[in-house]
């Protein structure tokens, strides 16, 4: 079996789900036409940011509507993909000696279903989510991700879902739907990170704070940035990156997405 690629997706606002024909969602649909259908998906979402390492192990995870102040239609969205207790157990085994908890009741958060709905709209591929341990530094996450590499050879698509630039306090709501609306500091940080990915400078990706104020404004908390490190950690030395949805919206949100492999 050909090794599966790895994918980072900028998920942006939950409202994207209700705008089925927006260009970001159209590109999500297109990108999965470039490689074989996976046997299963391992999702690392910014929206499962916990004090311990966990993995979903239920057979039919429920939907989690982890947002407030949005239209009721958004809380009616369904993505009834099955879980995979077998993959969950395999992930737990691969990540040893880290203590990882199987969570049979945790469902899919919007960092997962809001993009999977367009990547694989039939919801017929088993999905497992891995949490982000908020108590650990970036280097720990990068090193942990490397332990998942063998899954790529077994037909598992590993997806990181977050945003390289994600500052909700700085959002310009009047530009929420305007592609190309970004603050100077957001563009500068996005460009630094894109260049580090292009040249495979993993040290700069892990130690992103070296980019000073641009980094502090773009990544005020690491939750939305960390999923990118899981994807980049799984990149082989000879693998190229392909950018898509590489735009800023609302001043301080980047939709930049990257296919590896």
Feature locations, PLM:
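Long, well-ordered alpha-helical scaffolding segments within enzyme catalytic domains
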Residues: 23-34, 139-154
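Flexible, glycine/proline-enriched loop segments at strand-loop-helix junctions
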Residues: 74-82, 104, 131-138, 215
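A short aromatic-anchored loop/beta-hairpin motif
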Residues: 2-98
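Short glycine-enriched loops at secondary-structure junctions
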Residues: 46-50, 60-61, 108-116, 164
């Amino acid at each position: 079996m050909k090794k599966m690629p790895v994918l980072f997706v900028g998920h942006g606002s939950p409202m994207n789900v209700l705008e089925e024909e927006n260009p970001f969602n159209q590109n999500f649909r297109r990108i999965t036409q470039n490689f074989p259908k996976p046997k299963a998906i391992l999702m690392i979402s910014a929206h499962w940011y916990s004090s311990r390492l966990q993995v979903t192990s239920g057979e039919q995870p429920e939907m989690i509507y982890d947002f407030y102040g949005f239209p009721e239609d958004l809380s009616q969205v369904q993505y009834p993909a099955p879980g995979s207790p077998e993959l969950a157990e395999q992930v737990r085994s691969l990540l040893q000696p880290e203590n990882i908890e199987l969570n049979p009741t945790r469902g899919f958060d919007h960092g997962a279903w809001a993009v999977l709905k367009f990547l694989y709209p039939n919801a017929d591929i088993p999905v497992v989510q891995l949490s982000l341990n908020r108590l650990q530094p970036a280097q720990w996450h990068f090193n942990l991700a490397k332990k998942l590499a063998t899954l790529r050879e077994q037909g598992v698509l590993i997806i990181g879902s977050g945003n390289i630039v994600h500052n909700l306090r700085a959002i310009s709501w009047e530009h929420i739907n305007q592609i190309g609306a970004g603050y100077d500091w957001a563009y500068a940080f996005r460009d630094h990170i894109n260049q580090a990915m292009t040249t495979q400078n993993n040290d700069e990706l892990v130690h992103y704070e070296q980019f000073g104020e641009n980094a502090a404004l773009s990544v005020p908390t690491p939750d939305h940035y960390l999923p990118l490190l899981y994807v980049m950690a799984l990149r082989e030395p000879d693998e190229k990156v392909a950018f898509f949805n590489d735009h800023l919206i609302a001043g301080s949100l980047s939709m930049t997405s990257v296919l590896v492999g």
